Structure formats: structure tokens, C-alpha cells
Amino acid sequence: MTENNRAGAVPLSSILLQMITGYWVTQSLYVAAKLGIADLVADAPKPIEELAAKTGAKAPLLKRVLRTIASIGVFTETEPGIFGITPLAALLRSGTPDSMRPQAIMHGEEQYRAWADVLHNVQTGETAFEKEFGTSYFGYLAKHPEADRVFNEAQAGYTKQVAHAVVDAYDFSPFKTVIDIGAGYGPLLSAILRSQPEARGILFDQPHVAQAAGKRLAEAGVGDRCGTVGGDFFVEVPADGDVYILSLLLHDWDDQRSIEILRNCRRAMPAHGKLLIVELVLPEGEEPFFGKWLDLHMLVLLGAQERTADEFKTLFAASGFALERVLPTASGLSIVEARPI
């Protein structure tokens, strides 16, 4: 008797079917996030007619979406046609410290559409997003402010969730000046500065992002110790930091562009400086790892990639750095530490 035929075993066909239809879940969560359902039921369960009226949806159709995702723990149907919050659904609220609503929206809109062309991407090498939209992903964001805002909110939300794991895994006490390159709204830099009251920071990103980050830094209680600088890391980065942090940045770029960023960091860095890359470092072999899926996502969006430790060594060798160590964190991210040579 095979494993698949034993009483109670889930048929392999059922397992594969669940994988094949995964996009059903993505888009159902997108509907709930986009319509703001979690905000509407945060204080108490609401009837579907009220939810439909407030969101401009058709009540019978919205009910079908909500009852389906309630079956996987996202919302609960407390009585027939009345839906309430659950711990998972609470993550889809707006403006909360642990909100994942921007991520659900981001992955359900342009990024979702790009995945329709992944076969073309694999066969031709043309980035799927560029095939779908006729421009690069960051070029698209530059022309679509709302998509850019959602992207930066999603990035900030994810980084905020993992920042404490990074701070717990690494000793930042030797550094007086911390420079975060491509920092977004600065959740990681804020966490580092809160852990090191004597340190000062510089947040570096595109001018419009750096400008928006000032308010976030003040809200985090570190605005008086952290400056913001707008610029282009392909041209130059702020000089004389004791440590340069590139968190979830190099995976947005191919090797050539990544080396350009690293060389600019090397030129700006004093001899005693450190470089910290915070990313999902790919393990060798077949073990399941979220970073392998993110590697494909970077291919689809940007023609870029996640990397192994050896691939980071190659980048460092071409840009004036030497790998010192790779430190895992509780978040799944790793801290790749390098020194200038």
C-alpha cells in the first residue's frame, strides 16, 4: 500500500490542487483589504448588508468572499450573514503597528498582474513586469504616486515586523553614525537608534521618500538624532558612516547594478567602517525557504534575485569588500557583515 492510499491520507492530487489554486486566496484577501473590511468590523461584527453599503459592493457577492476567507480564519461569521474580526483579519486593519493591509493590496494589484507573464520571463529573459506594463517596476512607481505610497507602506510594515530580530542579533553599540541606504521610511534605522541612545543616524533614499520619512522618524522618537538625505545611490551615498546598512535593497537589482551601489558605499566609507546587508540569504539544497519564492518574485518584478552567501562573496570581491560572517536572525532574514579592503 502506498503512502497516498493509506486511510486518512490526503491525496497527492488534493495537495497539488491547493497549490495550483493559491491565487484564489491572494485575490480574496486583496478584496477584503482593498475594501477595508477589517476596519469596519474592528469594534463589533457587522451584517453583510451594512458592509456592502459602506464599501459599494454587492451584498450577496461580498458575502461569498467573506465566508470563504472566514473558513481559513480570516474573519468569522458569528451569525449567518454577520462577520467579525479575528486575529488574522486584524492584520488587515489600517494604520496599526502590525498592519499587513498595504502588503495585501500591493500583492493583489500590479505585482499580481506581472505574474501572468512569468512563463514569458523564463523563456525570453524579459522581465515579466516590463512585458505587462511597458516600463520597469520602479519606473512605474515614479509615475503612479498611489502605487508608490502603497509600496513604501508595505516595505515599512514588513521591515517593522522584523526590525527587532535584526537588532537582537547584532551588536550595534560600537557605531556612532549609522547610515541606512535605501531606508524607506526608516523602521529598521529607528529600531537601531532606539536600542543605542548615543548613536546618530542618516536615512538615505529617493528625495520624496526621505522627505516623507522625517515624520515617521519623529513618531518613532528618534527624529532629533536622525537626519534625512535624498539622493541616488547609483551616483553617491553619504560619507563617513561607521556602519552602512542595506536592508532588502540589493535583491532589487542585478549583479551589475548591485556592484555599483556597493562601490559607492565603499568610496564613502572610512577604513574602519562596516557594511551590513540584511536580506534572505538562500540556503543550498531543497529545504523549504520563503526566500526561494521571493527570489522568483524579484525575477518577475525586477529581473533581480535573492542570493546565497557565495554570491554575496562574489559581489563583495568586485566592489572592495570582504565577507566576514553571516548571522541568522529569528525573522528568517540574515545579516551579511563585510569589511572594506
UniProtKB/Swiss-Prot annotation:
EC top class named in words: transferase
Gene3D superfamilies in the record: Vaccinia Virus protein VP39 (3.40.50.150), Winged helix-like DNA-binding domain superfamily/Winged helix DNA-binding domain (1.10.10.10)
Keyword hit for Methyltransferase: yes
Active site: 251
EC number: 2.1.1.-
Binding, S-adenosyl-L-methionine: 205, 231-233
GO molecular function, one term: identical protein binding
Reaction equations catalysed: 1,6-dihydroxyphenazine + S-adenosyl-L-methionine = 1-hydroxy-6-methoxyphenazine + S-adenosyl-L-homocysteine + H(+); 1-hydroxy-6-methoxyphenazine + S-adenosyl-L-methionine = 1,6-dimethoxyphenazine + S-adenosyl-L-homocysteine + H(+); 1-hydroxy-6-methoxyphenazine N(10)-oxide + S-adenosyl-L-methionine = 1,6-dimethoxyphenazine N(5)-oxide + S-adenosyl-L-homocysteine; 1,6-dihydroxyphenazine N(5),N(10)-dioxide + S-adenosyl-L-methionine = 1-hydroxy-6-methoxyphenazine N(5),N(10)-dioxide + S-adenosyl-L-homocysteine
InterPro entries registered for this protein in UniProt: COMT-like, O_MeTrfase_dom, Plant_O-MeTrfase_dimerisation, SAM-dependent_MTases_sf, WH-like_DNA-bd_sf, WH_DNA-bd_sf
Disulfide bond annotation, renumbered to this chain: none
Listed Pfam families: Dimerisation, Methyltransf_2
Domain of life: Bacteria
Gene Ontology process terms (BP): methylation; phenazine biosynthetic process
UniProt entry keywords in alphabetical sequence: Methyltransferase, S-adenosyl-L-methionine, Transferase
Keyword Oxidoreductase tagged: no
Domains as described in the record: Contains an N-terminal dimerization domain. The C-terminal region contains the S-adenosyl-L-methionine binding site.
Assembly and interaction partners: Homodimer.
Family to which this protein belongs: Belongs to the class I-like SAM-binding methyltransferase superfamily. Cation-independent O-methyltransferase family.
Its job: Involved in the biosynthesis of phenazine natural products including myxin, an N(5),N(10)-dioxide phenazine antiobiotic, which has antimicrobial activity. O-methyltransferase, which converts iodinin (1,6-dihydroxyphenazine N(5),N(10)-dioxide) to myxin (1-hydroxy-6-methoxyphenazine N(5),N(10)-dioxide). Catalyzes both monomethoxy and dimethoxy formation of phenazine natural compounds. Acts on a wide variety of substrates, catalyzing O-methylation of phenazines with non-, mono- or di-N-oxide. Highest activity with 1,6-dihydroxyphenazine (DHP) as substrate.
Protein name per the record: Phenazine O-methyltransferase PhzM
Organism: Lysobacter antibioticus
Gene that this polypeptide is encoded by: phzM
